[in-house]
Amino acid sequence: MRRLLLLAALLAGPALATDGPVFMGFGSHTPVEADLVIPKGMVLRHVYDVTAATPDKRNPGFETAARFINSHVANGVPERDVAVAVVVHGSAIDELTRAPAYAARNGGKANASEAMVIEMLKKGVRFIVCGQAANARGVKKAELLPGVELAISASSAHAILQAQGYSLNPF
């Protein structure tokens, strides 16, 4: 009987340890009894490409990246085995700028995505800005939120991430 209890505790341990969500208040997800199961020990490296800003609400492209993390952790993948990057160009770059720079570009409004981005950065999500697009939009590196990375271009960021084993989100 003692061995059965020990075995039950050991089997339940990983499930209890991997409950999500990682992010509260954004990145909504649903537990799924999946047929295509993530192999144990597999590290998921995934990159999203986001171009469009959504000035009056959280950026749905950024939130999709959070959902990817939340859904996989809630379905048993250890948080340490989920790596996400977001390559940003176009008007979405504004949503990665500090409050004064954002307000100056958006009629004094507050950045609805800022708190979400900061929390995601704290959890290891990489936000990488296309340097070519930033230059074209007049965004300086010093205006970016702390932790946001600047690449030569979105293309070079994707090439580097692909070489590091990241898959590109197809939609």
Regions found by a protein language model. Give the residues of each.
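Sec-dependent N-terminal signal peptides
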Residues: 4-12
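Sec/Tat signal peptide C-region and signal peptidase I cleavage site
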Residues: 13-17
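A cross-taxonomic marker for long C-terminal extensions/tails that follow the last structured domain
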Residues: 18-28, 97-104, 109-171
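Acidic, glycine/proline-rich low-complexity segments that act as flexible tails and inter-domain linkers
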Residues: 23, 34-40
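Acidic/histidine-rich, surface-exposed loop or edge segments in extracytoplasmic proteins
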Residues: 38-55, 95-101
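Solvent-exposed, acidic/flexible segments
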Residues: 54-61, 79, 110, 151
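Histidine-anchored nucleotide/phosphate-binding helix
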Residues: 60-77
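Acidic helix-start/capping segments at beta-turn-to-alpha-helix junctions
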Residues: 78-96
